[in-house]
């Protein structure tokens, strides 16, 4: 991960394009021969910093997009992050068999169906543990699946992921 203007900016939200670019770099920036993302996603064009990364991620199945769009500048949610890392791990032939129980975490019921298996894996693999919160005076963990993901959170999860 790199910052801009000499700053890492850890509290800034990360975008979908930034995470896919990070995963593409982690994969060694493989040659991109399948550019179908340029026609299948109406919001991905040649010449952007993320073009090759999105084309690679789409061709490999790391991303699927939504309704003909990748939404590169949209802020990345925690459930999207779990899905990207899970699919990336599968593409890289990593062990994705770990499963963790997130059902007791605050906001676990807000998790979208597409993200349930990836989130169970991310919790089981120790990548995501939830944020500390207090609910009715009791300490709890908040899964916050639809909350935005900061650059610091992605850096932390990336370090845990690489340690696997």
Positions of PLM-derived features:
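Feature responds to low-complexity, polar/acidic, surface-exposed segments characteristic
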Residues: 1-20, 24-51, 60-79, 88-116, ...
């Amino acid at each position: 991960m790199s910052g801009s203007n000499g700053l890492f900016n850890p509290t800034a939200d990360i975008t979908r394009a930034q995470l896919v670019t990070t995963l593409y770099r982690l994969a060694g920036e493989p040659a991109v021969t399948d550019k179908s993302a340029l026609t299948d996603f109406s919001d991905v064009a040649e010449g952007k910093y993320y073009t090759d990364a999105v084309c690679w991620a789409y061709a490999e199945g790391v991303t699927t997009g939504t309704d003909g769009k990748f939404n590169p500048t949209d802020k990345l949610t925690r459930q999207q992050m779990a899905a990207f890392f899970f699919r990336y791990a599968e593409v890289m032939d990593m062990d994705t068999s770990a499963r963790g129980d997130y059902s007791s975490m605050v906001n676990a019921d807000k998790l979208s169906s597409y993200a349930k298996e990836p989130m169970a894996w991310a919790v089981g693999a120790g990548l995501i543990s939830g944020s500390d919160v207090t609910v009715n005076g009791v300490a709890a963990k908040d899964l916050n699946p639809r909350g935005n993901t900061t650059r610091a959170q992605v850096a932390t999860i990336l370090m845990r992921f690489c340690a696997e």
